[in-house]
């Protein structure tokens, strides 16, 4: 029987209920637990909201309650260099990035993991809803979280086998409701704290106002695919493929009462394309190209396989065929897909296992690129 007291686990604690219960469960299981709060954004921000200060107070209260030491570490430079610069570059290129995927890859499971090793960690743990399972050969497989509505493997799809070997996900087998019940029973200060949303580590800011501080918006024309001028857009970076709200055109043009959606972008001409109908033909595609292809365990350099995939968080899986060539892949859909968005992650699954994924570069319809950028 393993003596867990000799196994040191460093827990990434955000001041939320999930990471609080993660630390509690590991402590109850007898591990040598240390809590670490990551400060990744300057909280003396333009809105005067010091959320990190309050979050750290919650970390301290929880750590004191369960009896573990805790520290704070500053990764603001790493976050800026490895995540935020990427985030801005993607928007400049007319894409819609997913900073959470990059944040997990570069900060929570790289910068934080490296720091944890300096504290003598055997493992790191986070409050993500995912599971790890080691096979007889010692390979770690990442499985979906038991709570389908909270499963976060989509955001963890760029983790390497080396990172997974050092990672524990104590909440993976639990439902979110059970996590809150555990926190309440233990009297943790974060038991009723609402879940955070918004950009990874930056929080719930007015997105348009926030982004405009770093990227100057260029207004331009809003057009239909067949060339009708529909007015002015506020800046291409503020719109994503398939978006409905915020267009300001309602149903006033023509007799069709269907809602308007963003169906494409032309970065060189600064044109936003719009169309009516949720399944507008310009939104539909049957394949995509992806880069930064990465698998959570060893795979051949070139191979073809069938699996299911997600093209955005919380959407149902879709059947696909994947043709891998190094760090690039062509993904062919069994059924046409709506609003495949460059910059977002495509993530591959074999049943419960998350195999990895990549970043969407372009969607295609019958071999022709969609007018998405």
Swiss-Prot record:
Cysteine disulfide partners in this protein: 103-200
Interaction with tRNA: region residues: 150-152, 312-313
Residues the UniProt record annotates as site (Interaction with tRNA): 128, 344
UniProt-annotated location(s): Cytoplasm
Source domain of life: Bacteria
Residues reported in the UniProt entry to bind ATP: 12-19, 38, 127
Reactions accelerated catalytically: S-sulfanyl-L-cysteinyl-[protein] + uridine(34) in tRNA + AH2 + ATP = 2-thiouridine(34) in tRNA + L-cysteinyl-[protein] + A + AMP + diphosphate + H(+)
Name used for this protein in its record: tRNA-specific 2-thiouridylase MnmA
Native source species: Streptococcus pyogenes serotype M1
Organism taxonomic ancestry: Bacteria, Bacillati, Bacillota, Bacilli, Lactobacillales
């Amino acid at each position: 029987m393993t003596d867990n007291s000799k196994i040191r686990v460093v827990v990434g604690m955000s001041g939320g209920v999930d990471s609080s219960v993660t630390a509690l469960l590991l402590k109850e299981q007898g591990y040598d637990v240390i809590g670490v709060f990551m400060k990744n954004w300057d909280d003396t921000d333009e809105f005067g909201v010091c959320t990190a200060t309050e979050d750290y107070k919650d970390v301290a209260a929880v750590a004191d309650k369960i009896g573990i030491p805790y520290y704070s570490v500053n990764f603001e430079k790493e976050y800026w260099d490895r995540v935020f610069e990427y985030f801005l570059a993607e928007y400049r290129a007319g894409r819609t990035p997913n900073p959470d995927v990059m944040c997990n890859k570069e900060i929570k499971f790289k910068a934080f993991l490296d720091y944890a090793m300096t504290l003598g960690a055997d493992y790191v743990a986070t409050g993500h809803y995912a599971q790890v399972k080691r096979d007889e050969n010692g390979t770690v497989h990442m499985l979906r979280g038991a709570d389908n509505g909270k499963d976060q493997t989509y955001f963890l799809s760029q983790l390497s086998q080396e990172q997974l070997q050092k990672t524990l996900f104590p909440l993976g087998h639990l439902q979110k409701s059970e996590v809150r019940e555990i926190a309440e029973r233990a009297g943790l200060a974060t038991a009723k704290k609402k879940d955070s949303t918004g950009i990874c580590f930056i929080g719930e800011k007015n997105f348009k106002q926030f982004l405009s501080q770093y990227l100057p918006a260029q207004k331009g024309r809003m057009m239909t695919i067949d060339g009708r001028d529909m007015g002015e857009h506020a800046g291409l970076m503020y719109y994503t493929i398939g978006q409905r709200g915020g267009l300001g055109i309602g149903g006033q043009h023509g007799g069709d009462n269907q809602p308007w959606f963003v169906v494409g972008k032309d970065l060189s001409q600064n044109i936003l394309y719009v169309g009516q109908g949720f399944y507008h033909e310009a939104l539909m595609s049957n394949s995509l190209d992806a880069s930064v292809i990465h698998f959570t365990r060893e795979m051949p350099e070139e191979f073809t396989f069938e699996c299911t995939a997600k093209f955005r968080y919380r959407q149902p899986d879709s059947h696909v065929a994947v043709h891998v060539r190094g760090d690039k892949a062509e993904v062919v859909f069994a059924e046409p897909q709506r609003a495949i968005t460059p910059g977002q992650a495509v993530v591959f699954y074999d049943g419960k296992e998350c195999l990895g994924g990549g970043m969407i570069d372009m969607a295609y319809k019958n071999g022709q690129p969609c007018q998405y950028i």
